[in-house]
Design a protein with these regions (language model features):
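SAM-dependent nucleic-acid methyltransferase catalytic core
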Residues: 3-47, 56, 103-224, 248
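SAM cofactor-binding core of SAM-dependent methyltransferases
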Residues: 52, 57-127
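Catalytic metal-binding/acid-base residues of hydrolase active sites
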Residues: 89, 211, 259
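Class I S-adenosyl-L-methionine
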Residues: 1-84, 192-205, 215-221, 230-323
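Phosphate/nucleotide-binding beta-alpha loop and adjacent structural elements of enzyme active sites
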Residues: 101-149, 153, 259-264, 280-295, ...
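Short aromatic-enriched loop/helix-cap "lid" or pocket-rim segments at secondary-structure transitions
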Residues: 95-98, 159, 219-220, 267
């Protein structure tokens, strides 16, 4: 079987395996839990829709906005492609590097910390000192404390407040067992600005999940990366620069964003898809905010997503525009 046919078969088999069998669900595909970390805006329910669009003859995928990595890990683990992921949040990518290179050591370090509110507050204080440059943690300790703070927080969010439902030893043990057993396939990570990555890989296929657009007629009204109280990677994100650079990108791409008039207009020359799914906030959190209470909404939310697809343009390397 040729390499192209092999990837096509893996893709088809994977999509069949995640078809939702729940007749009451609007979700076409089941949630794919590939990442050890919870992530705001994570794509565990979008994996199937994105995999559908992957051209069958690409050899690797570049991700400039790695985040929680659900899509990227799925592509490397289940589809067998090389994936290189980047993110501007260095502390996050330090965690990912340790998670990939030494999951058992990370597990042992996490096992030493009990999931109590006292430990959460102590770890948060140390992480805050590192973030503010008062101390410098070694990579292993930084990865350990990041995971503990992040995965046990509400949201989740960096240096966020604790979530009681995760201060549970059984849940915590299952959580860190996923750290220990993590095996993502051919996945590499680094920390960089998306502009540098688009310049570095002009002919590679990309999956991009940037901070969602905040503006008129957008359902996203506040930045959340790395935390809603200091969204330095979200506020004033240069969406216009990303748009203009993607126009020149030859390798093809899939872009996720929020479905709003501005994004639809900016990318009107590309194929646009509007998948629908339902998700619960925090994948376990059932608290709802004042706005949703006033609107008599539940903690179950409908997606408002747009997925934009541009096939590879670079025929010089034998890339065919097949999906």
């Amino acid at each position: 079987m040729s390499e192209l046919a092999s990837f096509k078969t893996r893709k088809e088999n994977f999509l069949k395996s995640i078809i939702s069998k729940n007749p009451e669900s609007i979700n076409k595909y089941k949630r794919v839990v590939a990442s050890p970390i919870r992530y705001p805006g994570g794509k565990s329910l979008a994996v199937g829709y994105i995999v559908e669009l992957l051209p069958i003859n690409i050899k690797r995928v570049i991700s400039p906005f790695f985040g929680g990595g659900s899509v990227e890990i799925t592509i490397s683990k289940y589809l067998g492609l090389e994936v290189i992921g980047y993110d501007i949040f260095e502390i996050l990518m330090n965690y990912w590097n340790i998670q990939i290179e030494d999951p058992e050591l990370l597990y042992e370090k996490l096992k030493e910390i009990k999931p109590t509110e006292e430990n959460f507050n102590n770890v948060k204080a140390i992480l805050k000192d590192h973030w503010e440059g008062k101390i410098k943690l070694d990579p292993i300790t930084l990865a350990t404390y990041f995971f503990f703070n992040w995965n046990l927080s509400y949201g989740p969010g960096f240096l966020s407040w604790t979530s009681e439902i995760y201060l549970n030893e059984k849940k915590y043990e299952k959580m860190i067992e996923r750290v220990r057993d993590f095996s993502p396939g051919n996945l590499k990570v680094g920390s960089a600005d998306f502009r540098d990555i688009l310049k570095k890989y002009p002919n590679d296929f990309m999956y991009l999940d940037p901070p969602y657009y905040i503006g008129p007629n957008s359902k996203v009204f506040k930045g959340i990366y790395p935390q809603r109280n200091f969204p330095i990677y979200h506020k004033n994100f240069p969406h216009e620069i990303l748009r203009d650079m993607l126009k020149e990108h030859k390798g093809g791409f899939i872009l996720s964003n929020n479905n709003c008039p501005t994004i639809r207009k900016w990318y009107k020359d590309y194929k646009q898809f509007f998948p629908k799914w339902q998700y619960t906030m925090g994948q376990g959190e059932t608290r709802i905010g004042k706005n949703r209470r006033n609107a008599k909404s539940t903690y179950i939310k409908d997606s408002s997503e747009i997925i934009i697809f541009s096939p590879p343009k670079n025929k010089r390397r034998g890339v065919l525009n097949k999906v």
